A protein has these predicted regions:
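Glycine-centered recognition micro-motifs in short, flexible terminal segments and loops
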Residues: 1-12
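N-terminal helix-rich module
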Residues: 13-51, 55-140
Length: 140
């Protein structure tokens, strides 16, 4: 009986120690997934701009990038993305526009993704003038 109590106590102590780190691990995975989601949307927008030979816009939803974003070509909505629950995302205020050749119409500020009250690593998504996005760990 004493052995069982000892094992249960050790398991409880280990669980208490591991829980905060597990939370940060989960948040880190959510941040990474959100980064890949915006990179995927940017690659899609670029390919649509080339395919249509016309401008394609990626813009934040009302209230900012963490509330989602849309990919449009003129008045046609090509794609809509949901809000990022529990994450903060910053990006170019005016959105970004891909020209028909797949290049950006202007330089933009990078996208930043983080979680409040967490030590999980932030994610930074840069888009070069050729229109290709890249994702890396760390702040922008």
């Amino acid at each position: 009986m004493i052995e069982l109590i000892t094992v249960v106590t050790i398991v409880a102590i280990l669980a208490a120690i591991a829980t905060p780190y597990f939370r940060d691990f989960i948040l880190g995975q959510r941040i990474r997934a959100a980064g890949y989601e915006i990179v995927s949307a940017l690659i899609y927008a670029r390919s649509e701009a080339i395919k249509r030979n016309s401008g394609v816009t990626v813009a934040a939803a009302t209230g900012g990038w963490q509330n989602g974003w849309t990919v449009t070509s003129g008045a046609i909505t090509l794609s809509q993305h949901e809000a990022l629950q529990g994450l903060t995302m910053t990006g170019p205020v005016a959105g970004l526009v891909y020209n028909g050749n797949g290049r950006l119409a202007a330089t933009i500020s990078p996208f930043g993704i983080s979680a409040a009250n967490s030590s999980a690593p932030q994610r930074c998504i840069n888009v070069d003038l050729s229109g290709l996005p890249s994702s890396q760990a760390g702040s922008c």
